[in-house]
């Protein structure tokens, strides 16, 4: 393993989209009370990819990925690989359609985290490095102080945000019906140690989200960008 892969994000106990191998943080409120400020971002429906000085990685960091849907990202990496140093950029690769089709994508890769050795960088630093390498970040939904927050208020806010359509427009790939966003990711707005990841990042996923199967990689489809949708309408 060249570098450590992205940690497993635990679900909120009220997240309905858990699967058999998912983990739930039943003591999430104890963790959140140790955090000063939370940032809630949209959970995008794609593949977790990492850009580091050693290559482009998918979930496994045993070896760089060579999948066809990362070709464009690997070409981009060639341009920035010598400038990354110890910084590892993590983002959602939306090049291939999964269980949600987005209609307003301006690009296919959105940054959600950055790591430097044993430290996960603050949200401000994530945005700084994303901008430095001319990469967009995932949609920021809300930043809020934990002071005055209660478990019930947090739950209501997370569920409310999860029931909205995606920032980039979301529909079911097969029926083309408008659907809600995949979910919401909450994280400590500050920096924290890699070993403390599970106590600083939490997620909520919509019920029955995953609709792809083991044959997905054989029949994958490229996600159109917004200007391609616009061209289709004009024609």
Question: Where would I find each of the regions flagged by the language model?
Answer:
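Core nucleotide-handling region used for phosphoryl-transfer chemistry
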Residues: 1-235
